Each structure stands twice: as C-alpha cells, then as structure tokens.
C-alpha cells in the first residue's frame, strides 16, 4: 500500500506540469485515492502505526531524494501524529477511528507543497531551474491567492469524509473487519 501511496503522491506532484494551480490544489482531490489506501492499511495495521507507515515511507524516500524541506517535515510529523492520536482516541479497530483519523491524514499532500508558502523565494528559484521558462511567473498568482488556498483547504474536509465513505463501500470486506 505504501507504494500505491507513493504513486499517488507522484501523480499529484506531476499535475504541476499542467499548471501551477493543479499542483497547489490537487491535494483537495487526492483524498479520493488516499482513502482507499489508508482504509486498507488500517485494516492491516490494527494498532498504532498506519499513518506512520504511509507518511513515514514517503518522508524517508523524500529525505533520501532531497525533496523534504523543513516545512514538509514539520507538517508531515504534525499531520501524522494527529492522525495517530485520533485513531487511538476513537479506536484502532473501529470505523469511527479510521474515519476521524483520516481527516488530518487527508492533508498529507498539502504538507509536501507547503514550501510554496513557507519558502516562496526558494520555490520560485527552483521553478526557474527545473520547470519551463515562465513557470515561476505562473506560480506567483497561485501563491498570492491565499483566499483560494483557504477555500481548498476547507473543502478537503468534506472530500475526505466522502472519500472514506466511498472507500468503505468499495472495500466492503476489509471495512467489515472494523467495528
């Protein structure tokens, strides 16, 4: 499941090839895939560690690849810890525990792209080096549109709730093992 999670992350990051707005806001739609991976992982890891296994795998790979900046590391640790705490509070072997813990977990991709707002100058400089000419200029209005970022972050919550319900209905056999 960790490999599927990595592939989903990579596809999310690759959406930036279309337009910077895709990269910045795809995180609101990725929970539609993350939910299936997270639910199945939670049915395999019945106690502490499902969120850590998934986000830890990505974090280690990104550290090795040089893709993990301090903003990403901090945000990932906070999101993962919150997901683990909620799952413990509501029950490791319950649907309620998985549902509640998935809400913070759903924001995992936003941790990865947080550098746009925590290190804007560095992100723009990297875009000049790594992306086609003019990409950095396309990024500026996206980065400056804080209202849209807030709207997308807020919309991630109902998307996460809906996504987990869809995952439960689609993965009936694994979901049935939860109380």
What are these regions (language model features)?
Residues 13-16, 23, 58-85:
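Interfacial aromatic-anchored transmembrane helix boundaries in multi-pass membrane proteins
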Residues 48-52, 69, 94-96:
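Membrane-helix interface segments
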Residues 16-24, 87-95, 168-176:
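Membrane interface segments of multi-pass transport proteins and intramembrane proteases
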Residues 2-7, 76-114, 160-164:
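Short helix-perturbing small/polar motifs within transmembrane alpha-helices
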Residues 1-49:
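Hydrophobic transmembrane alpha-helices
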Residues 23, 98-173:
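Membrane-embedded alpha-helical hairpins and interfacial helices in multi-pass inner-membrane proteins
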Residues 4, 8, 30, 34, ...:
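Alpha-helical transmembrane segments in multi-pass membrane proteins
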Residues 28-29, 51-56, 73-74, 98-101, ...:
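Hydrophobic alpha-helical transmembrane segments
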